[in-house]
């Protein structure tokens, strides 16, 4: 099974990289895990709404270029649906049981995801109403995907 996270911009901070590398290593037992980075657009503070929409649209096109038709896509969105870790694990298990072997998660850039990306998504996941930095979101999501596999496989990691 293939799990892909698409993120906007390069991850620079060593501590995020180290955390993600740890979960990527652990996930190697359960799936082919990859993180795909697409270039971000400059988004200075002074942008108008139209300019912000353009930034999201451009980043969105780059994200959509990395998604194939067969992929089941989760968009990470603050206003999406919240789940518990157990519910998420059940959902992943069900998707694989019903033949989805390519699952892709999309995290927006500093301004968020474009309407086109949200439209392509098969489901939206919210990690609550807090706004998390997109780099940190990659780490938190990697951990939750790992947690889901430990739940599916009955390992004692999840309490
Ligand atoms: C800095 S946030 C963008 C904030 C933007 N105002 C928005 O509402 O999307 C960057 C990305 O991280 C992800 N993200 C941040 N907090 C999240 C949360 N609580 N739940 C789900 N995704 C989140 C989303 O993919 C978002 O597009």
Curated annotation (Swiss-Prot):
| Chief location | cytoplasm
Which Gene Ontology cellular-component terms appear in the entry? cytoplasm
Report what the protein is called. Ribosomal RNA large subunit methyltransferase H
Ordered alphabetically, the record's keywords are:
Cytoplasm, Methyltransferase, rRNA processing, S-adenosyl-L-methionine, Transferase
So what family is this one in?
Belongs to the RNA methyltransferase RlmH family.
- Where does the protein end up? Cytoplasm
InterPro entries in the record, alphabetically? Alpha/beta_knot_MTases, RlmH-like, tRNA_m1G_MTases_N
Question: Which top class of enzyme applies to this chain?
Answer: transferase
State the Gene Ontology terms under molecular function: rRNA (pseudouridine-N3-)-methyltransferase activity
Q: How does it assemble?
A: Homodimer.
What catalytic activity does the UniProt entry give for this protein?
Answer: pseudouridine(1915) in 23S rRNA + S-adenosyl-L-methionine = N(3)-methylpseudouridine(1915) in 23S rRNA + S-adenosyl-L-homocysteine + H(+)
**Role this protein plays:** Specifically methylates the pseudouridine at position 1915 (m3Psi1915) in 23S rRNA.
What's the domain of life for this entry?
A: Bacteria
Chain sites annotated for binding S-adenosyl-L-methionine: 76, 108
HAMAP family xrefs: 23SrRNA_methyltr_H
Q: Name one Pfam family in it.
A: SPOUT_MTase
- Stated EC number for the protein is 2.1.1.177
